[in-house]
């Protein structure tokens, strides 16, 4: 009866974990997960918007290199009192309610000829800002790809843990069957039966907890993919590791890391700001041209109509003489910002180099341990089967079985952990050296 109950429990748990439970589950691969995340990611969309703004601003007009053209027009009506006095008093005039109209219109074009090369520096800065935003987008693409890969392989890791637990459940079920058989022939006591039941129950609970961990790991992946967490997905994959990475190669490619390149571009941006600020101390020469029209009409007075119209051309020169020392302070502040950007770059490079070195050590160490752990896992499987056989023959104790079972579980978990840690280190090394593909 008890055996039937445990079989039913195991069947129910299997049904819960089954991909065909309630709704059909979508089988998803790594490439599909990455493509979906890159397409839907809010973080990527925000960076793309910043890049679009920087691209729009990278223009000669924004930099001030193109002429500015403006048009003006005014039409004023007046009603006034006219009083005129002449040397001949008989010509004196005083008149109220005199209507008048004043019309002015003009078209003006202006272009900067020289302003201390500020326009060139501004255009270079805008181009550098666009380039920096492209690097930031590349960095976000790399980061999102890395996160998806880590979460994807975490699901695989948790599923592998589940398989180890299920194999241990099979061993516990086999042990329980042996105890029941021994009890029937009078060579096993009630304590052995109770202990076997307790051990099996503990594993069944562990399986249920592991199913929850898997569901939550999938929810994290779905969140990064910007899909509803209720989406049912199945991942049928294994952890394969690229064991060919070399420290010298990834260190050489670290210079290509977009985050590091963005920090380097910030130095250039601040250097261009320095040039823009310094240009404020130079004279500004501007050429102006246009066309003006003025018309003045009056119902009375000496002049009933007066009109002027025609083109004009001119040169405007502005020379900054004194501004309270503000220009010098602005230049000094710009130089400080450039120095700070250089320090930030050096700090980022140092941190990244250290992280790369430590990650490579982890990667190499786990690769070196993996063959030994594979052998340990294989031996633990053989040991468990051997001890179960001996226990059935009365040549081993329940303690021996439990120890063999614990060794099997530990070896299984350790092997999975080694592979996962090595894979995560590989992903991080490729991210740091800008080698992740998407």
Where are these regions (language model features)?
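Terminal intrinsically disordered/low-complexity segments used for targeting and assembly
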Residues: 1-36, 86-89, 211-249, 430-438
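Bacterial Sec-pathway N-terminal export signals of envelope proteins
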Residues: 22-70, 74, 229-271, 320-321, ...
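Small/polar, glycine/serine/threonine/aspartate-rich low-complexity segments that form flexible
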Residues: 25-26, 72-108, 236-243, 275, ...
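Periplasmic alpha-helical coiled-coil/stalk elements that build and connect Gram-negative outer-membrane
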Residues: 32, 56, 143-254, 362, ...
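Sec/SRP-type N-terminal targeting helices
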Residues: 45-49, 62, 113-141, 191, ...
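Short segments within alpha-helical structural elements
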Residues: 205-227, 378-435
């Amino acid at each position: 009866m008890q055996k039937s109950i445990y079989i039913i429990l195991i069947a129910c748990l299997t049904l819960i974990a089954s991909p065909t439970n309630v709704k059909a589950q979508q089988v998803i691969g790594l490439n599909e997960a990455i493509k979906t995340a890159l397409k839907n990611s809010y973080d990527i969309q925000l960076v793309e918007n910043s890049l679009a703004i920087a691209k729009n601003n990278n223009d000669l007009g924004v930099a001030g290199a193109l002429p500015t053209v403006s048009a003006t027009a005014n039409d004023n009506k007046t009603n006034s009192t006219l009083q005129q006095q002449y040397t001949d008093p008989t010509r004196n005039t005083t008149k109220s309610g005199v209507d008048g109209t004043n019309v002015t219109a003009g078209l003006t074009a202006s272009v900067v000829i020289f302003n201390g090369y500020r326009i060139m520096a501004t255009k270079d800065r805008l181009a550098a800002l666009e380039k920096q935003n492209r690097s930031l987008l590349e960095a976000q693409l790399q980061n999102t790809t890395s996160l998806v890969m880590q979460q994807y392989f975490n699901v695989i890791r948790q599923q592998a843990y589940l398989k180890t637990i299920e194999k241990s459940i099979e061993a516990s079920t086999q042990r329980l069957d042996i105890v029941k058989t021994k009890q029937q022939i009078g060579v096993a006591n009630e304590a052995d039966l109770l202990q076997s039941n307790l051990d099996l129950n503990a594993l069944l609970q562990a399986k249920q907890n592991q199913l929850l961990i898997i569901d939550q790991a999938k929810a994290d992946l779905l969140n990064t993919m910007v899909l509803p967490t209720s989406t049912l997905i199945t991942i049928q994959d294994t952890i394969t590791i690229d064991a060919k990475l070399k420290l010298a190669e990834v260190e050489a490619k670290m210079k290509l890391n977009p985050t590091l390149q963005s920090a380097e571009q910030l130095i250039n941006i601040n250097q261009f700001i320095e040039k823009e600020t310094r240009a404020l101390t130079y004279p500004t020469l501007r050429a102006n041209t246009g066309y003006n029209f003025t018309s003045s009409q009056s119902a009375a007075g000496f002049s009933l109509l007066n009109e002027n119209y025609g083109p004009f051309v001119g040169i405007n020169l502005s020379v900054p003489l004194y501004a309270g020392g503000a220009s010098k302070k602005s230049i000094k502040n710009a130089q400080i910002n450039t120095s700070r950007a250089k320090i930030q770059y050096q700090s980022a490079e140092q941190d990244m180099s250290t992280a790369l070195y430590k990650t490579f050590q982890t990667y190499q160490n786990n690769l070196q341990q993996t063959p030994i752990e594979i052998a340990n896992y294989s031996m633990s499987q053989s040991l468990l089967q051997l001890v179960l056989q001996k226990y059935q023959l009365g040549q081993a104790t329940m303690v021996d079985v439990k120890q063999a079972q614990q060794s099997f579980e530990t070896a299984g978990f350790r092997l999975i952990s080694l592979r996962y840690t090595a894979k995560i280190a590989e992903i991080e090394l490729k991210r740091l050296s800008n080698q992740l593909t998407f």
